[in-house]
C-alpha cells in the first residue's frame, strides 16, 4: 500500500464514525435501541438532510436522480473518468436496527473524508451513493433505487405502488425531492468504474469464526410473491365449518404446503412469510380476504428457479375453500461478484492485519444491481449474534472502523486505475 494511501487509511476515525451512527440512530428512533426510518418518509428526509450537511461542510459535490438516490462526489483529477462508487441505504425496516444500510453510507463518508484529510489525489472521482428504498418495507419491492438507476427496472413501474396507509410512491418521492430542491440532477445508468459496498453481515458467520472482515463473493437469488385468497365473510358462531369459504384457513394450508416445498435438509433454502393482511380482521368474523408475502432464496440458480416455478402450483393445490391469485413481485437471480474486487478487499484486510474470510451474502443488497454495470463487491463486518432487522441489532465500533479502513484502501486502489 502506498504511503499516501496508508495515511488516508490511518485517518479513518472510529470515534467520528460511531458518533455519526448515533446521530443517525436518533432519526426514527424506537424503543429498544431500534430505528423505524421508512423510505421516502419524513424520517428519511431528515436523515438525507443530515448527510447533505456533512457533505457540504467538506465541500463535496451533491446530486440526486429521478428516484431520489443521493450522490456525494469527491472529484478526481481526470474529470472524464468514470467514478469509483460506494455506499448503501438509509431506510430501515419498521422495527430495524441502527447499523443495517446506514453503516455503508457512513463508512463511505468516512472514507471520503479520510482521503480528503490526507490530501490524496485520485485519478477517478469517488462517489458515495445513498440508495432509495433498499428495504422495501414501505413500498415493495426491495433494492428499488439501485434497480432503477442501473436500468434493471423502470421507475414508471413503481410509481403507483401504495404503502399500508394508501400513500402512493409517486407522492412520497415528489415530497422527498422537493425537500432538497437545490441538488444537481443526475442521469440514470451513469458509468461507474467499480462499486464497493460496506455492510454489517446480518448473520453469525464472521462472529462465530472470529473474523473482522468478510470479502463477499456474491448474493443468493430470490423470488418474491404476493398471494391473495378470496373467500366470504360469515358469522364465526353460526356458520358451519363445512359451509365456510375461510380465506385465513386456506392461507394456513398454503403456508404449510410452501414450508414442505422448501424443506431442505442442508438448511440452504430460505423461506419466509413476513407480511399478512386479513379482512375484516375481526375476532368473530370468518376472514373474507387474506394477502400475504412469500420470500424464497437460494444461492444456486437452478434450485431457485425450480422453487420459484413451484410456488404457484403448490399454493393452488393447497387451497381447499377459496380462489387464489399468485403475483410475482421480485425476481433476482444469484449474483457473483467481480473476482478483482473480492481480491482487493481481501488484500486490503491482509495489509491491515485484519482477520478475514470469504463468504456469500444471504441477504439482497444494492451491489447486486451495480454488478450488472461495473465490477462490484462488498465488505462485511460482524454484527452481534448475527441479529439484524431487529431493534437488538448491534455492532462494535472497532469492527465498523476496521471495515471503513478496508473500504478506504480498496477505493483508493480502484480510483487510481
Give, region by region, the residue ranges found by the protein language model.
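A short beta-alpha structural unit
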Residues: 39, 272-281, 293-300, 323-342, ...
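His/Asp/Glu-rich mid-to-C-terminal helical/loop segments that flank catalytic regions of hydrolases
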Residues: 219, 235, 239-265, 311, ...
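Catalytic-core environment of secreted peptidases
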Residues: 58, 70-103, 108
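Alpha-helical metal-binding/catalytic segments enriched in His/Glu/Asp
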Residues: 86, 95-135, 223-229, 238-261, ...
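Zn-dependent metallopeptidase/amidohydrolase metal-coordination segment
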Residues: 17-30, 87-88, 355-406, 411-414
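A non-catalytic alpha/beta surface segment that caps or lines the substrate-entry region
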Residues: 29-75
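Midchain, well-structured core segments that form catalytic/ion-binding scaffolds
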Residues: 134, 140-301
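N-terminal capping segment at the start of a domain
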Residues: 2-41, 158, 328, 332
Amino acid at each position: 500500500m502506498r504511503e499516501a494511501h496508508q495515511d488516508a487509511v490511518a485517518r479513518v476515525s472510529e470515534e467520528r464514525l460511531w458518533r455519526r451512527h448515533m446521530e443517525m440512530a436518533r432519526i426514527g428512533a424506537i424503543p429498544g435501541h431500534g430505528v423505524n426510518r421508512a423510505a421516502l418518509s419524513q424520517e428519511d428526509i431528515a436523515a438525507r438532510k443530515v448527510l447533505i450537511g456533512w457533505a457540504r461542510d467538506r465541500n463535496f459535490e451533491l446530486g440526486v436522480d429521478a428516484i431520489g438516490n443521493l450522490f456525494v462526489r469527491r472529484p478526481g483529477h481526470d474529470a472524464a473518468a468514470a467514478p469509483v462508487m460506494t455506499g448503501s441505504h438509509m431506510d430501515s425496516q419498521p422495527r430495524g436496527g441502527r447499523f443495517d444500510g446506514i453503516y455503508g453510507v457512513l463508512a463511505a463518508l468516512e472514507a471520503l473524508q479520510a482521503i480528503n484529510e490526507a490530501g490524496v489525489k485520485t485519478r477517478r472521482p469517488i462517489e458515495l451513493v445513498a440508495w432509495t428504498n433498499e428495504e422495501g418495507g414501505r413500498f415493495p419491492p426491495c433494492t428499488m433505487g439501485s434497480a432503477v438507476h442501473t436500468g434493471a427496472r423502470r421507475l414508471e413501474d413503481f410509481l403507483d405502488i401504495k404503502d399500508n396507509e394508501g400513500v402512493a410512491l409517486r407522492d412520497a418521492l415528489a415530497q422527498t425531492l422537493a425537500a432538497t430542491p437545490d441538488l444537481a440532477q443526475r442521469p440514470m445508468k451513469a458509468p461507474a468504474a467499480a462499486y464497493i459496498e460496506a455492510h454489517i453481515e446480518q448473520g453469525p458467520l464472521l462472529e462465530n469464526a472470529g473474523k473482522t472482515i468478510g470479502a463477499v463473493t456474491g448474493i443468493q437469488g430470490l423470488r418474491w410473491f404476493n398471494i391473495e385468497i378470496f373467500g366470504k365473510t360469515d358469522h364465526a358462531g353460526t356458520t358451519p365449518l363445512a359451509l365456510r369459504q375461510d380465506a385465513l384457513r386456506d392461507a394456513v394450508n398454503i403456508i404449510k404446503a410452501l414450508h414442505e416445498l422448501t424443506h431442505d435438509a442442508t438448511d440452504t433454502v430460505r423461506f419466509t412469510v413476513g407480511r399478512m393482511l386479513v379482512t375484516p380482521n375481526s375476532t368473530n368474523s370468518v376472514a373474507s380476504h387474506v394477502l400475504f408475502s412469500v420470500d424464497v432464496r437460494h444461492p444456486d440458480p437452478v434450485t431457485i428457479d425450480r422453487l420459484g416455478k413451484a410456488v404457484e402450483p403448490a399454493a393452488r393445490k393447497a387451497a381447499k375453500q377459496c380462489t387464489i391469485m399468485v403475483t410475482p413481485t421480485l425476481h433476482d437471480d444469484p449474483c457473483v461478484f467481480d473476482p478483482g474486487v473480492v481480491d482487493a478487499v481481501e488484500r486490503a484486510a491482509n495489509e491491515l492485519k485484519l482477520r478475514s474470510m470469504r463468504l456469500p451474502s444471504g441477504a439482497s443488497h444494492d451491489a447486486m444491481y451495480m454488478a450488472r454495470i461495473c465490477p462490484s463487491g462488498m465488505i462485511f463486518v460482524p454484527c452481534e449474534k448475527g441479529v439484524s432487522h431487529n431493534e437488538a441489532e448491534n455492532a462494535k465500533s472497532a469492527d465498523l472502523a476496521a471495515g471503513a479502513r478496508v473500504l478506504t484502501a480498496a477505493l483508493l486502489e480502484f480510483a487510481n486505475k
